[in-house]
């Protein structure tokens, strides 16, 4: 499937022959550079252009220092002001369009921050946004999943600026052996369209889902939330994160930040253990890139077995205690 975007004629003085730089928008919390940015830089390297990182935040000097060490980065641009503290797109989007006047590519990780920001940037630039790419074929052509990952679309854009979100699980993390220069951007875009109210972060002793090397997830087959303690005991032995299918979340077994899938978190751990999960398309889209998939389900016809490297047809309430004891 090929989709060709034909941009409108614009009276821009941008000369693409001379300006072929990629701007990566950093994903961070004002203290640490998130690993998703490293995956995005790897995608930018496949485009093959000079790469710069933009950090918009408040008191984010440590983030800039982290970004400067990312291999392949020529420059880190820092916009440090209270109006960027919570990275509201109404403030950050005009900042990006100002900074990116000499850039041909604008990339961000397909996280909540990137998905919230890049559509607004694309609208301000009057170009199409390309979402969730998993492969770079050349500077104009990219591959992205469609139909919950059951098909891949090859998307070609002739827009003068490509605005792209990157599926981070499809690219490895860039190394941190660089020594880029750090520059300040003094642009301030205060706005009154939106106001930050509050945020509540989930705290857990376990690894964060998108960064975990081992994940054990439960589905509707767990029957109720109390039975997730069986997963917790195994997770404690493995040092694993705990996930869930949408069915388990919708049933109220666990909070929605456990959800793995197309409408949840996209993960690609070294080991993914699916327990009592039938394997709906939406769930498979979120975990099928895992290096090793183990499925435990009493229904031998469950779709999850079609993607599993190892499958066990058994009663999870018998298997999990035995597994926990064996570990």
Language-model segments: which ranges?
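N-terminal glycine-rich FAD/FM-binding segment characteristic of electron-transfer flavoproteins
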Residues: 3-327
